[in-house]
Structures are given as C-alpha cells and as structure tokens.
C-alpha cells in the first residue's frame, strides 16, 4: 500500500510517498526560508501563496521520482493541524481534492504526531513505551507514549518554545532568520563558562518548561558586555548550554517518573548536535536508549506525514468530503490506534 503525504503547516512544502513494504519511495521538499528572511520570520500570507505555487509541482515530482502514476496511490495524507491556518488549508484542499479525484481515502494527520513518528523511518526504530521530547519552533513537550495514539502530556512550555527562544535570541545577536541553526554554529566558537545563564524551572518539581526569560537574560547580557564577535559567541554558547541542560534535566525527570528506558527526540531542535550529544551521554549512563530521526526528517517534511498517514489509515482513520483544519490541536486528543 502506498500513501502520498502532503505537509504545508508552516514554511516548508513537503511531499513524499511511503510504501508499507518498500519504505520511502519519494521525498520532495521546498523551503521558503529565503522568502521570509527579509521579514525576520514567517509571514503567513506569503507562506500560503507559496504553498499554492509549489504543492502540485512537487506532487508531480514525487510521482516521477517514485516512477509511479496517480493510479498507484492508495491514500492521500495531509497535515490537518496544528499550524498556520492558511498554509494548512492549502495542503488540506489539495489533498482532499486529489483523494476525491483519484477515488482513494483522505487521511488527516496531526503535525506533531508526524514528528513523533519520524524516528520510525530509521533502520533502528524505537519500541513502545518511550518518553518523547517534541522540541521545535512552536512546541516543547514531554509525552509518555505507550502506543500509537496513546499519548499522555507530561509537561510543556508555559511560554516560548525552545526553538522560538533560539530564533529570538539569534535575532538579538544580529543573526539572520532562521536564527536557531546559526546561533548553534556561533555557539561552537564560544567559550564555555564565561557567562552562566539560568536553567529555568529546574529548581522546582514538575516537567513544564519556560524559555522566555532566557531571551531577556541574553538581551541584558549583550547590553552589559558589548557585542564584539567573541562576546556574541560566548553569549550564544551560554544560551545554548542553558537550553540543552534544561531539556536534559526535564527528560531525566520524565524517564524517572515513567520508569521508561527509551527516549525519543523529535522536531526541528532535535537536529541540534549539542542536544543530541548530551542526551546520548545521559542515556548511556542510564543504560537506556535514545532515538531520533536523521537531520532532514527533524524539520518539517512530507515523509513523516506519509508515514503517519499510513499508520492512521491502517487504524481506520479517513476524512469526509469537507476540508477541515485545526490550527490548534492538542496531541492528547488523538484516538488510540
């Protein structure tokens, strides 16, 4: 069985085809980074218009890459939320229309479930149960996962997500959009320990996060110490270390509270090398395992939507003729498969 996946929740147009026997057959991705760079962030209207231009050509390219035709597709999966409402509507409308025209089921997919399941695309996928750290520009959550759709929210950010804090702090440091990866690159040139940032909410019980204060702390540190190149690198290092340590401390608590031995990391920030190294070291000490997707599947992509669509289709999930999206959609509301 082959599923076409369509991802248009924000500023990447991702199209992929997944076969339940052969695996990933095609993966096409277009990033709008250059389109939004001059504005310092994603402009929703521009994102929607660009998805309109790119979605159908990328579907054609994916079919060509897989050497398939429309008649070879058994279902169409699309991101139905959460995300930017206009961007979501583009993918949902195209996906639902193609499913109707091709007389195949349409499958609405939760964007964060796509991220959560992305490590399943690797050669060594995790078994259930596990703790999932979903860490991206819009979300920072710890989830207890005991099966498909069996998700319990353990903790989440009460203000900025980790990825959002990375981007905002990068802007304070004079870095271009998207700033997160550029901040990490700058941090690699920084001196550890010159500046010490707080580890928010680690001095109290619980698994919630707070990252907005780190941005303020960074702004004050820049104002007090100047902004020569080395100082900026040292501040970037201190900021990244604070975020990584905070995530690691909370992951450790989540593992202790659940008793699970496996940790899955997903979302755009999961591509951060420092975070990967620290969590791998922690799990080795705990005699556990850590899993994550390859870097190109950490950010938004169609492959994770095609795979999640396959999983949901086998569980009997399909959409009616209407086009419905949910810009806000708690992961815990998904039914068990």
Swiss-Prot record:
Pfam families: TsaD. Keywords: Acyltransferase, Cytoplasm, Iron, Metal-binding, Transferase, tRNA processing. GO terms for molecular function: iron ion binding; N(6)-L-threonylcarbamoyladenine synthase activity. GO terms for cellular component: cytoplasm. It is an enzyme of class 2 (transferase). PROSITE patterns: GLYCOPROTEASE. Fe cation binds at residues 111, 115, 300. One of its GO terms (biological process) is tRNA threonylcarbamoyladenosine modification. Gene3D superfamilies: 3.30.420.40. Required for the formation of a threonylcarbamoyl group on adenosine at position 37 (t(6)A37) in tRNAs that read codons beginning with adenine. Is involved in the transfer of the threonylcarbamoyl moiety of threonylcarbamoyl-AMP (TC-AMP) to the N6 group of A37, together with TsaE and TsaB. TsaD likely plays a direct catalytic role in this reaction. Belongs to the KAE1 / TsaD family. This is tRNA N6-adenosine threonylcarbamoyltransferase.
């Amino acid at each position: 069985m082959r599923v076409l996946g369509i991802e248009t929740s924000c500023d990447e147009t991702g199209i992929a085809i997944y076969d339940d026997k052969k695996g990933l057959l095609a993966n096409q991705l277009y990033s709008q980074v250059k389109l939004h760079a001059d504005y310092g962030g994603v402009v929703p209207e521009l994102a929607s218009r660009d998805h309109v231009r790119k979605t159908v050509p990328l579907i054609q390219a994916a079919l060509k890459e897989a050497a398939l035709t429309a008649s070879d597709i058994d279902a169409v999966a699309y991101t139905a939320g959460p995300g930017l409402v206009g961007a979501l509507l583009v993918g949902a409308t195209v996906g639902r229309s193609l499913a109707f025209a091709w007389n195949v089921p349409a499958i609405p997919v939760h964007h964060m479930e796509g991220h959560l399941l992305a490590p399943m695309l690797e050669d060594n996928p995790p078994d259930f149960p596990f703790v999932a750290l979903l860490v991206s520009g819009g979300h920072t959550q710890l989830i207890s996962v005991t099966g498909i759709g069996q998700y319990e929210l353990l903790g989440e950010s009460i203000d900025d997500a980790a990825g959002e804090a990375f981007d905002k702090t990068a802007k304070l440091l004079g870095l271009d959009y998207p700033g997160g990866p550029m901040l990490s690159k700058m941090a690699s040139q920084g001196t550890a320990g010159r500046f010490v940032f707080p580890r928010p909410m680690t001095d109290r019980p619980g698994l919630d996060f707070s990252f907005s204060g780190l941005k303020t702390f960074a702004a004050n540190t820049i104002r007090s110490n100047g902004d020569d190149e080395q100082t900026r690198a040292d501040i970037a290092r201190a900021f990244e270390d604070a975020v990584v340590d905070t995530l690691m401390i909370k992951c450790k608590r989540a593992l202790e509270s659940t008793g699970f031995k496996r940790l899955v990391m997903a979302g755009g920030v999961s591509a951060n090398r420092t975070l990967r190294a620290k969590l791998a070291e922690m799990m080795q000490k705990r005699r556990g395992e850590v899993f994550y997707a390859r870097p190109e599947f950490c950010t938004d992509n169609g492959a994770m939507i095609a795979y999640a669509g396959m999983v949901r289709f086998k569980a009997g999930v399909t959409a009616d003729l209407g086009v419905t999206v949910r810009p806000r959609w708690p992961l815990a509301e998904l039914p068990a498969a």
